[in-house]
Amino acid sequence: MPSDFSLAEEYKRRVIGAFNGRVAKVVLYGSRARGDARPDSDWDIAVFLTDDPTPDDLDRLSDLGTDLLYETGQYVQPMPIPSRRFDEDTTLLKAIRSEGVPL
């Protein structure tokens, strides 16, 4: 994996630490995964949870991203998704499956 994904790897590390075994998979997608990001592009990161995400889960994921924003100036856009939905035929999930980079 290219070293320029280190911010995404750090986000994954923090998410796993905060979610106590509920993380099934973390995938970078969007412009950073495709390799066509600009310097100010955000980091689109899908967090697949073993159960249904709650509003508190989204708050926690956002807080972890905000911490990295303050530390690095880079914005993480988290997307919590139940892992049972990974194979669904939606535009977002098809994009994650086709262009995503598992972390």
Place the predicted regions along the sequence by residue.
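Short, well-ordered beta-strand segments
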Residues: 44-46
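Conserved H-loop
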Residues: 31
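Catalytic core of pol beta-like nucleotidyltransferases
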Residues: 1-25, 34-39, 49-103
